[in-house]
Amino acid sequence: MNFEISSSFSPTGDHPEAIAALSEGIKSGVPFQTLLGVTGSGKTFTIANVIKEVQRPTLILSHNKTLAAQLYSEFKAFFPNNAVEYFVSYYDYYQPEAYLPSTDTYIEKDLAINEEIDKLRLRATASLLSGRKDVIVVSSVSCLYGMADPTAFAEKVTHLERGMRIDRDKLLRRFVDALYVNNKLEFKSGCFRVNGDTVDIFPAIETFDGMAYRIEFWDDEIDRISSFNPLTGEEYDEQDELNIYPTNLFVTTQERINMAIGQIDVDLGTQVNFLKEIGKPFEAKRLYERVTFDLEMIRELGHCSGIENYSRYFDGRAAGDRPFCLLDYFPKDFLLVVDESHVTIPQIRAMYGGDYARKKNLVEYGFRLPSAMDNRPLTFDEFESLTPLGIYVSATPADYELIKSEGVVVEQVIRPTGLLDPIIDVRPSLNQIDDLMEEITQRSAKDERVLVTTLTKRMAEELTTYMTRMGVRCNYIHSDVDTLERVQIMDDLRNGLFDVLIGVNLLREGLDLPEVSLVAILDADKEGFLRSHRSLTQTAGRAARNVNGKVIFYADKITASMQQTMDETNRRREKQMAYNEAHGITPKQVMKNSVSMLAEKQQTAEPYAYIEPEPSLVADPVVQYMNRTQLEKAIERTRKQMTEAAKKLDFIEAAQFRDELVKLEDLLKTKKD
C-alpha cells in the first residue's frame, strides 16, 4: 500500500519548493539534507509530503518521548490508512543499576514497565517485519538501545493459512515458544486456549483492534480462521491467513539459552581469576556469588533479574560487537528524519559515554561480567553507519548537520498564517529594568504575555521578587523547577493567571506560546552558550507566533552572535513581507487552545504572582501519621494513578505519581509492624 495523505491543508508558501527539493534530493541519491524551517512554518506537514513523494519506510527521531508522542499524533492524522507506529522507552520509571566507589554505595535497578507502550513497541517491529513499505515509526533515542536479533524474532513469527497442514500440538508448542500462555480462565492479550479441535489465540499486537482469533482444525488441516470479540464471543470476519507475532521483543530458544549458560560459566571463571590476580579477592567472591545465582535462575525459570547484561550470549554476538536495535528491523532503503536535530544529534553522541561510565564501575568492582558492557546503546559512529539517508529538521541546525548535508539546505521561512519573524530592538542595559517594566505594562493592557531571559537562576528569582513587589503578575522557571511544574506554569501563563515568565533558558523546543508578544533578553551581549546565535534565535522565535511579536536585546555592545541573529531575522522578514505583499496576505494571529498536558486538570486558583509550590502528598500531616496498612493502600492507589496516566501517554503526570510513590515507599520503610 502506498502512503496517502489525509489533510484539509494544501502546500502553501515555501511548502511546494521545500517538498520538491527534498523529494528530488532523495530520489537523485543525495544522502543527507537539512530542512531549515522557522517556528510555525509547518515543517511536519512538509516532511509528511516528502514521505508521500518518495514512498519509503521512515524513522522519525525525536529527542524526548513527549515530543515523540506529539509527532506520532500528527503523523497518525496525516496517514490514517498507513502504519504509523510509536517506539519509545517502555519505562514509566527507571533507576539504572550503579555503584559509587567513593561512598561504597550500590544502587539496585528499579523500574516500572508500561505494558501499553510495550505493545506499541511490539506493534512497530511487527509492522516493519511484515514486509509492507508504508511504515512510519516515530521514536525517541530508545530505538538505539539493544533489542533481539531481527532474524531470530522473525523465526518466531507463526504464519497460518486456511487449508495449511500442521499438527495441532506442534502449533501449540510454537505458541509457547513465542511466550504465549495457555489460559482458559483469563483469556487476555498474550494467551491462547484449546477446546478440542479449536484453538483461540489473543495476539499481543492485535490488542489495539480488540480482536482475538479462532483457528479450527479438521484433522491436521486448518479448516477455518476467524476473528472474534474476546469479551462477547461474537464472530467477525473469516481470514485467509494470519501472522502470530511473539509477545516479547527478546524472545529466544531453549537451545540458545543452554549455549548462553555454558558461555557465561566459562567467562565467569575467567573474570574471577582475573580479579584475584589483580588483588581483588572480595570483588571476585562477589562476582562469583551474583553470577552463579543468576545462572541458577536462568536454568530454572529461563530468566533472571538483570538478564539484559547477558544479552550478548543470547544474541550470539562476539565481545565488542554492537547490539541489534530497531534500525536493524528497517529495510536498507529507509529514510531517517531527525527532528530538532540541533538537540537530538548531541543527545545521540552522549548516550554511549554515559552508559559506559556507569557499567565500568559495575564490572571493575565485581557486580557484573564484562559482557554487561555490550548491553549498550549504539555509538555515534555505529548510528551513522546504519543511517545512510536522512533529513535533519531544525530552525537552527548545528555545524554537524550543515557539514553532513554538504550545503544542501532547504529553507522554509514563509508561514501559512502570514506571520513575520519578530522585530529585534537593541537597547542599552542602563535602566533596563525600568524600561522593561514599561514594556510589560503596555503588553499587559493588551492581554499579551512576556518572556524574560536572564543569565543565572539567582537573577531570575531576584527579578521575580522585585517585579512582584512592583505589582507585576509574574513567575519564574529554571532547571530546579521539575517537569510537571514547568508545564503547569506554561499553562498558567497562557491562561492569563500571570503575565510575565522569567527564566534562564526559555528556548525549549516544542514551547508553543502564541499569547507571547514580547521576548526580553537581558545581558544579550554576554557571549556564551545561553547567548550564542542558535540560543538567541531559538529564544527570539518564541515571539514568532504572535502578530505583534517583538524581541528586545538589552546590551551595551553588539556581539557577533547578536549581529548574526539580527541579520538572519531581517533577511527572513524581508522575504516574508515580499511574499505577503505579492499574494495579498494579511498576517493572522495564531489561535490555539491551551490543552494542558496534565490530563486537562481544572485550574481553579486565582490569578497570582510568584508563589511557593504546593507541598507534596507525603508532606501532608495526615499521611505522616498513617499506619502501615493505610500507607500500603495509599501506595497501591498512587501506583494505579501512575499506571492510568502512563496508559494515556501522559508521562508528565505519571512522573509526578512515580515520585510520590517513591516517597510513600520510603515512608513505609520507617513504619514498624
Regions found by a protein language model. Name each.
Residues 1-2, 442, 578, 582-656, ...:
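Acidic, low-complexity intrinsically disordered tails
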Residues 1-595, 599-602, 642:
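ASCE RecA-like P-loop NTPase motor cores
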